[in-house]
Amino acid sequence: MSSVAPVRREVVVSTTAERAFRIFTDGIDRWWPREHHIGQSPLQREVLEPGVGGRWFGVSQDGTTCDVGKVLVWEPPHRLVLAWQITSEWKYDADFVTEVEVTFTPEGPKTTRVVVEHRDLHRYGLAAPEYRKAIDSPTGGWGYILGHFAKIAAE
């Protein structure tokens, strides 16, 4: 299973790399799809704490928190690497890690290419092909999620 290809999606947004990075991180609650939440109660707020070691979690309407992962690399405004600690059963596991790398590359004075790569999918074992299919889905995977980000970045 070590040959499971990463999922890679990208979008070009009409803003600076600095602003794109800020919207992706500090502004995650403005664009993260509400249905992308593994908590028992609906998602009220999505949080990405700045800096290496910062938590990535959702706050449910009932007040409970639901971890997604943590910040592994924080290099504003060009690069962010997050630990995605969601198992194939869509549950948080502190001992399970795949990586999501996000890069912000200027393509002009106010144009930035944002690339998301979700890798280490072989760690899902036999569930890897199905999990990869889910996070690569045009109706719910990383492309869909980046579409939400792009709408906010265009404002």
Language model features with spans:
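Short, highly charged C-terminal tails/helix-capping segments
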Residues: 40, 150-155
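Hydrophobic ligand-binding cavity/cleft-lining segments
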Residues: 1-43
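Short beta-edge strand/loop motif at the mouth of beta-sheet-based domains
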Residues: 27-68
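Tryptophan-centric aromatic hotspots in well-structured domains and transmembrane helices
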Residues: 31-32, 74, 84, 121, ...
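Beta-strand/loop substructures that line and gate deep hydrophobic ligand-binding cavities in soluble
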Residues: 89-140
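Intrinsic-disorder/low-complexity, polar/charged segments enriched in Ser/Thr/Lys/Arg/Asp/Glu/Gln
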Residues: 4-12, 55, 66, 79, ...
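Hydrophobic-ligand binding "helix-grip"
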Residues: 46-47, 61-111
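Hydrophobic pocket/interface hotspot
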Residues: 20-24, 56, 71, 82, ...
